[in-house]
């Protein structure tokens, strides 16, 4: 009993010591002016996790609560030279669950993201300048909906040629998405503002034009109607292109010498152009505005373990009308490595004669 009490006390004392972020939604400017840190720099983080996840209306992923195991990878590399700042990041998160009543290996989180960005920091005002960035977001594995008993699935926007009614399919498993689908490509260019930059708070503002290409033909999303208990409604997804005004805000910081880290972000795209407008679709700009919001809070328990909470919300009304919401609580065991390669200092001047 005393030993158990001591272990609980040690856990409580270790809990406020925090961790590194698992995901990067933006490629941010460096923590010091570019001219102060020339050369290559990068970091690498790999880990395994035991997670509790709640998914609600996430395209291609299982809904509900699951106990999971998985792996995470997060790496970045960049180059700083004078006013030029080039940054790249790659992140991967995979979690799977297995248990009753389905007793099948199911994926509950599957995210692969790559982003590259270029910032130009003018010498006289390094906190404001032009930027360009591009990113790709996809999933590696096939997505499916599993049920413990045979279930009737009804695809609302597909017609059965034999009956003229919505297509129906019965089974314990319904395929939602193929590998590497849906895939979202994003490009943007504009002006960045970094008006405040301290260890405890870093503010990054992005304003400009952006475009989005979503590849989703032949994929499906659950759109169940609670009033119909005898079936599960499904919607077939379609690919599309959008372009318009884009704005973003990212707040990040650290406390207790970097042992607690936190981050919140928001990104909005108002599409002035969209492809594949269906007949009778009279939605306005507000109805079609894309919104991405998220937050992260990370606690470092020990050097090799962290407790992380991640919230991600996504609104893509041309893909799926409902908000996609994902909550993740991760106990992560991992290893991190970082390296900076600075340019050598200039040789000393020759002594005066």
Located regions from the model:
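Outer-membrane beta-barrel "beta-signal"
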Residues: 325-353
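Residues that define the transmembrane beta-barrel architecture of outer-membrane proteins
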Residues: 65-71, 106-114, 181-187, 233-243, ...
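Transmembrane beta-strands of outer-membrane beta-barrel proteins
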Residues: 42-46, 86-90, 114, 128-134, ...
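Surface-exposed strand-loop-strand hairpins of Gram-negative outer-membrane beta-barrel proteins
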Residues: 50-71, 100-104
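Transmembrane beta-strands of outer-membrane beta-barrel pores
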Residues: 48-54, 81-83, 92-98, 134-145, ...
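Outer-membrane beta-barrel transmembrane domain signature
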Residues: 210-296, 300
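Residues on the lipid-exposed face of transmembrane beta-strands in outer-membrane beta-barrel proteins
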Residues: 46-48, 71-79, 114-120, 136, ...
